[in-house]
């Protein structure tokens, strides 16, 4: 059966594009695929007409076999029992459509997904293990194997990223960067890591990916530049073949000397650092400061409309503003002693128990070096003379939520 290392998948969707039976789907959050239920496919067991069968297929020269699902559309009465029982919910019936093969989503063990994966994270159980990425992420900003596509550059909200030339390596100004993680979410090759996290990717849709064959001169610049080897040279007619789906990094388009490639990509919204856990709604906030006053760890700072900064109760000449620890994790990466860490805790959101991150601090390990203070993108952290010397990190106690009279704070 097919196995996927979801942890290191870059969510490019090439596997989905090449699968002949739509047995794998890629989203920013997950990779859903037919694993033939570990060798005992429930769809085969429940099919009342015998339209679905499990067969062994020889998959290598050594004679090793793997199970595959075979579908006979002539026997299928489209009852939908297989769809209902499918654990990953990958099986689908194209109801109401005239198709020779009405059922999609079963694995035929063609291994096209294995062959096309640009980072090798798709394998076959007992035959080929999925690749694993071994990285020692250092610092709150970490760049590894950047291909220089520049896709992240225009997406940075504070213009902290520069790229001298296409195909080079990006640079991120640490003084400007706010550790929001938009670059990491955008990077099609997982080359950027912010605050020590493996990013959740943004949704992405290729609107147009076309080749002007009349303009193409067959130089193969795009073939050589493609980090995933997605582009196939067609030497017989001095052109190339573009893939149906790829990472859409745009290197081929940018490096083509005759502008023969036209790529148009639409990115979904980036995930803000505070989209999960404690979330602030700016439209509802009246900058009263009740949340900052009740926070036991000074993890919220408000400048009121009267010019009072709370919880410091200091008069300032500033516009009304709100800042809080978003549990981005930059401080935990910067800490050389391991005194700060991001830990999961159970929270109830919309009636369901979910895992959410909180910052955990061990004062016994802290040497008060101040590295965390410098790393904090929102300038929330500060050292004090108290027994617990560090303040400003969110422990997700939720006391601020009921304190807000406008309902501007919530748990998501």
Swiss-Prot record:
Domain of life of the native organism: Archaea
Q: Does the keyword Electron transport apply?
A: yes
How many cofactor units bind, and how? Binds 10 [4Fe-4S] clusters.
Extract the GO molecular function terms from the UniProt entry: 4 iron, 4 sulfur cluster binding; electron transfer activity; iron ion binding; oxidoreductase activity
Q: Which cofactor does it need?
A: [4Fe-4S] cluster
Q: What's the protein called, per UniProt?
A: Polyferredoxin protein MvhB
Keyword annotations for this protein, in alphabetical order, are: 4Fe-4S, Electron transport, Iron, Iron-sulfur, Metal-binding, Repeat, Transport
Q: Which residues form the 4Fe-4S ferredoxin-type domain?
A: 2-29, 30-57, 67-96, 97-127, 138-166, 168-197, 207-236, 238-266, 276-305, 314-345, 357-386, 385-412
Give the matching InterPro entries: 3Fe4S_ferredoxin, 4Fe4S_Fe-S-bd, 4Fe4S_Fe_S_CS, Fe-S_Ferredoxin
What does the entry list as the binding residues for [4Fe-4S] cluster?
9, 12, 15, 19, 76, 79, 82, 86, 107, 110, 113, 117, 146, 149, 152, 156, 177, 180, 183, 187, 216, 219, 222, 226, 246, 249, 252, 256, 325, 328, 331, 335, 366, 369, 372, 376, 394, 397, 400, 404
For this protein, the record's PANTHER family field holds: ADENYLYLSULFATE REDUCTASE, BETA SUBUNIT, FERREDOXIN III
**Record-linked SUPFAM superfamilies:** 4Fe-4S ferredoxins
The record ties this protein, via Pfam families, to: Fer4, Fer4_21, Fer4_3, Fer4_7
């Amino acid at each position: 059966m097919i196995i996927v290392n979801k942890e290191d998948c870059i969510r490019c969707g090439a596997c989905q594009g090449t699968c002949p039976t739509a047995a794998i789907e890629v989203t920013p959050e997950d990779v859903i695929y037919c694993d033939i239920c570990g060798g005992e496919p429930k769809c085969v067991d429940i099919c009342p007409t015998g339209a679905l069968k499990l067969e062994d297929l020889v998959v290598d020269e050594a004679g090793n076999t793997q199970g595959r699902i075979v579908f006979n559309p002539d026997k299928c009465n489209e009852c939908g029992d297989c769809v209902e029982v499918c654990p990953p919910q990958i099986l689908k019936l194209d109801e109401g459509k005239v198709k020779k093969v009405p059922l999609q989503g079963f694995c035929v063990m063609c291994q096209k997904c294995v062959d096309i994966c640009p980072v090798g994270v798709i394998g076959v159980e007992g035959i080929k293990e999925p690749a694993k990425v071994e990285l020692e992420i250092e610092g709150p900003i970490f760049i590894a194997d950047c291909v220089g596509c520049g896709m992240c550059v225009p997406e940075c909200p504070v213009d902290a990223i520069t790229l001298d030339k296409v195909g080079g390596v990006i640079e991120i100004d640490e003084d400007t960067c706010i550790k929001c993680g938009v670059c990491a979410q955008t990077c099609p090759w997982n080359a950027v890591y912010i605050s020590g996290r493996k990013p959740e990717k943004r949704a992405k849709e290729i609107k147009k990916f076309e080749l002007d064959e009349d303009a193409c001169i067959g130089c193969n610049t795009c073939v050589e530049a493609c980090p995933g080897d997605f582009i196939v040279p067609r030497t017989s007619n001095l052109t190339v073949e573009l893939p149906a789906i790829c990472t859409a990094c745009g290197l081929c388009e940018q490096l083509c000397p005759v502008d023969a490639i036209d790529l148009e990509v639409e990115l979904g919204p980036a995930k803000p650092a505070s989209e999960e856990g404690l979330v602030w709604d700016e439209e509802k906030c009246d900058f009263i400061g009740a949340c900052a006053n009740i926070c036991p760890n000074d993890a919220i700072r408000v400048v009121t409309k009267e010019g009072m900064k709370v919880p410091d109760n200091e008069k300032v000449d500033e516009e009304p503003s709100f800042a809080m620890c978003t549990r981005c994790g930059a401080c935990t990466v910067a800490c050389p002693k391991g005194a700060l860490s991001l830990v999961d805790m159970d929270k109830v959101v919309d009636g369901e128990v979910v895992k959410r991150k909180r910052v955990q601090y061990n004062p016994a390990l802290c040497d008060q070096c101040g590295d965390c203070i410098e790393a904090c993108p929102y300038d929330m952290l500060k050292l004090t003379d108290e027994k617990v010397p560090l303040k400003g990190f969110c422990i997700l106690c939720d006391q601020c939520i009921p304190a807000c009279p406008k309902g501007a704070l919530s748990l998501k």
